[in-house]
Amino acid sequence: TRLQVEHPVTEFITGLDLVREQILIAEGKPLSFTQEELKIHGHAIELRVTAEDPTNNFLPDIGKLITYRRPQGHGIRVDDGYEEGMDIPIYYDPLLSKLIVHAATRELACKKMIRAIDDYKISGVATTLPFGKYVMQHHAFLSGQFDTKFIETYFTPDQLKSENVEEEKIAALMAIKVLEENGTATIATHAVNEERSKWKINRL
């Protein structure tokens, strides 16, 4: 029997290794636990990270993973098959990874997911990470009062675009600061302030 996409959530809250149990069954052995022994511990949330652009109707994106750094820490798990430098082609499903977090309560799990998203560094292709963070911070999701029409009801691309612009402004200011410290402030300031600058606001 195949595993469900959300099996890491089950593994986090039960402490079981479902793949190991499958292998035991394939070998003709019994499960290593009984129904009575199953206990649920805490809350887990899974986010499907895809190479799709949430600011452009979630259209699939292609390109090279220029940056690919997974978040680390207790209660954080990343199931993936990609490494930095690999190509995201047009031929397959745009799924990059599954990001799963576990904490004592749902509220803490949401906070941990936000931190994990912030620590998950991907550049070269657009991803659904910003949308995932938007959901984790939204009052409807936090309260549990939502349904499958969440995007239709609450989400507009502009909500992410404004955040991306602010992040890029901060990145540009940090770059100027580094250049100033290296003695190239004049060149950097001129490039940023120039009306016909070659800089384009795009994904990093």
What are these regions, as identified by a protein language model?
Residues 1:
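A short beta-strand motif that forms the metal-chelation/ATP-contact edge
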Residues 4-204:
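Catalytic cores of soluble metabolic enzymes centered on carboxylation/carboxyl-transfer
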